[in-house]
């Protein structure tokens, strides 16, 4: 079974591109990363930074998660991200996404040993 840490990497990590290269980026990535298999995942964020830099966030600023849990952490520096949001004409299995690029601080939930990101909570 896929671990929570591996799932985070699959759903949120894209260090090889510095930003969404094309308008088709989200459509391709959401599909290739298997987030459109049984439904269209409505919103997803990809982080264009090294895995080491994102894992390091677990040891940065401790903040409350959206769900009230206390194991979330905010990055000290802004990171290159792409938000993929389902567009109005999207209907499973033909999921259609709109990409928005930004440089924002990310907030992730961390757990385990080693202590690594398992959930993308927000960007600010």
Swiss-Prot record:
Compartments it resides in: Secreted
Comp. bias regions, Basic and acidic residues: 1-13
Record region (Disordered): 1-24
InterPro entries in alphabetical order: RNaseA (IPR001427), RNaseA-like_dom_sf (IPR036816), RNaseA_AS (IPR023411), RNaseA_domain (IPR023412)
Keywords noted in UniProt: Disulfide bond, Endonuclease, Hydrolase, Lyase, Nuclease, Secreted
Enzyme Commission numbers on file: 4.6.1.18
Subunit structure: Monomer. Interacts with and forms tight 1:1 complexes with RNH1. Dimerization of two such complexes may occur. Interaction with RNH1 inhibits this protein.
Family that this chain belongs to: Belongs to the pancreatic ribonuclease family.
Protein name: Ribonuclease pancreatic
Encoding gene (name): RNASE1
């Amino acid at each position: 079974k896929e671990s929570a840490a591996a799932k985070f990497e699959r759903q949120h990590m894209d260090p090889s591109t510095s930003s969404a290269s094309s308008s088709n980026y989200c459509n391709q990535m959401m599909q290739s990363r298997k987030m459109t298999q049984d439904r269209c995942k409505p919103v997803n964020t990809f982080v264009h930074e090294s895995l080491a830099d994102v894992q390091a966030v677990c040891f940065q600023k401790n903040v409350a998660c959206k769900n009230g849990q206390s194991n979330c952490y905010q990055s000290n520096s802004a990171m290159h991200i792409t938000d993929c949001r389902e567009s109005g004409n999207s209907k499973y299995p033909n999921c259609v996404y709109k990409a928005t690029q930004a440089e924002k601080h990310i907030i992730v939930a961390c757990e385990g040993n080693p202590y690594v990101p398992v959930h993308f909570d927000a960007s600010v």
